[in-house]
From Swiss-Prot:
UniProt binding sites for NAD(+): 170-176, 194, 200, 259, 312-313, 347
Family assignment from sequence similarity: Belongs to the FAD-dependent oxidoreductase family.
Name recorded for this polypeptide: Monodehydroascorbate reductase
Pfam family, one: MDHAR3-like_C
Keyword annotations of the record: Cytoplasm, FAD, Flavoprotein, NAD, NADP, Oxidoreductase, Redox-active center
């Protein structure tokens, strides 16, 4: 049997939910749109999995964090899709795609055809087994991407109360999971190869604050080395992590967060690629007519910096999906929409900490404020200056208005005459823009 739709979204993550909402706003008719997802649940806000989902008390659970609550919008329950005439194909994995013929095939043999396709397949976690790490297939080595992953991890946390946890990776997932494990009053060690945490974004000064804060919370941090092997007990459960520097760590549970890869293998050789993703224009149109790509998989023009980027973050997943849906409907009636003009935005929350970053982290940096990890209420930030202009801004502990101010600075790119004066002014500089 062939299922025919005017529009199909392949992928059921954050982008799918926000695209569906925008399709409805634009006037999609019942029966025109389908979402095909290999997950068993309707689109949800993925960031919850490394935060509130694992809280020791009152943990978040579906349906509480279906899209689009993450941006303050309506929660789109499965019934919402039914009411709007949107077909959800859950637990359905697409195994082949013919973009020229506009044809998809699922693992269970279902066939789909479409007029317009939105690729929203997101990223897959990088696994240590991909690199042939010895023992990396032992039980109780976890990765976190989907609700099923979080459920398995949560069960292990509750089952092994006095276990030793090792978190491999010093990025978003590593930092957020280490914090939530500590909130569960667990023994936690972080291991990562870089000289400091979050090296793609943080300066050494910013990282020093978070590493100090985590250490004060009792988290052991081991930097500059990697896991090269694991040993298991007679039940096949992990018991040790072997590090490249020769150290061996006891571990009953290991959580790996070493990044992701965009899931574009279905479309290899059919679409133009760039920077590891699918090349798109400012409307997320690909090189193939009537095919769009959004979220993690899209490499798009970053107008603000006259550059081309691929961005793995929930904010872009939401906004790119909305842009594509608007562009699709505009094209259907011979109209156009404004080009995507994205301001890069990243954020994280852990313990009592909350930071936001806007813009580009290139050039000279200026640190301001109180970045002492022992402070009762730390509040500090950093500006990035390139060619005499502020191009990026970071703030820990900001109020909503202060966070809006640093976003405004990053967008406006004001000139800086004296970096020492900028350091003295700190947040007040942003408030004046």
């Amino acid at each position: 049997m062939v299922h025919s739709f005017k529009y199909i979204i392949i992928g059921g993550g954050v982008s799918a939910g926000y695209a569906a909402r925008e399709f409805v706003k634009q006037g999609v008719h019942p029966g025109e749109l389908a979402i095909i997802s290999k997950e068993a649940v309707a689109p949800y806000e993925r960031p919850a999995l490394s935060k509130a989902y694992l809280f020791p008390e009152s943990p978040a659970r579906l349906p509480g964090f279906h899209t689009c609550v993450g941006s303050g919008g309506e929660r789109l329950l499965p019934e919402w899709y039914s009411e709007k005439g949107i077909q959800l194909y859950l637990s359905t994995e697409i195994v082949s795609a013919d973009l020229a013929a506009k044809f998809l095939k699922s693992a269970n043999g279902e066939h789909f055809d479409y007029q317009t396709l939105v690729i929203a397949t997101g990223s897959a976690v990088i696994r240590l087994t991909d690199f042939g790490v010895i023992g990396a297939n032992a039980k109780n080595i976890f990765y976190l991407r989907e609700v099923d992953d979080a459920d398995k991890l949560y069960e292990a946390i509750k089952r092994k109360k006095n276990a030793k946890r090792v978190v491999v990776g010093g990025g978003y997932i590593g930092l957020e999971l280490s914090a939530v494990l500590k909130l569960n009053d667990l023994d936690v060690t972080m291991v990562y190869p870089e000289p400091w945490c979050m090296p793609r974004l943080f300066t050494s000064e910013i990282a020093a604050f978070y590493e100090g804060y985590y250490a004060n919370k009792g988290i052991n941090i081991i930097k500059g080395t990697v896991a090269v092997g694991f040993t298991a007990n007679s039940d096949g459960e992990v018991k040790e992590v072997k590090l490249k520097d020769g150290r061996v760590l006891e571990a009953d549970i290991v959580i790996v967060g070493v990044g992701g890869r965009p899931q574009i293998s279905l479309f290899k050789g059919q679409v133009e690629e760039q920077h590891g993703g699918i090349k798109t224009d400012s409307f997320f149109k690909t090189s193939v007519p009537d095919v769009y790509a959004v979220g993690d998989v899209a490499t798009f023009p970053l107008k603000l910096y006259n550059d081309v980027r691929r961005v793995e973050h929930v904010d872009h997943a939401r906004k790119s999906a909305e842009q594509a849906a608007k562009a699709i409907f505009a094209a259907d009636v011979g109209k156009s929409v404004e080009e995507y003009d994205y301001l890069p935005y990243f954020y994280s929350r852990s313990f009592d900490l909350s930071w936001q970053f806007y813009g580009d982290n290139v050039g000279e940096t200026v640190l301001f404020g109180d970045n002492d990890p022992a402070s009762s209420k730390p509040k500090f930030g950093t500006y990035w200056i390139k060619e005499g202009k502020v191009v990026g801004a970071f703030l820990e502990g900001g109020t909503p208005d202060e966070n809006k101010a640093i976003a405004k600075v990053a967008r406006a790119k004001p000139a800086v005459e004296d970096v020492n004066q900028l350091a003295e002014e700190g947040l007040s500089f942003a408030s004046k823009i």
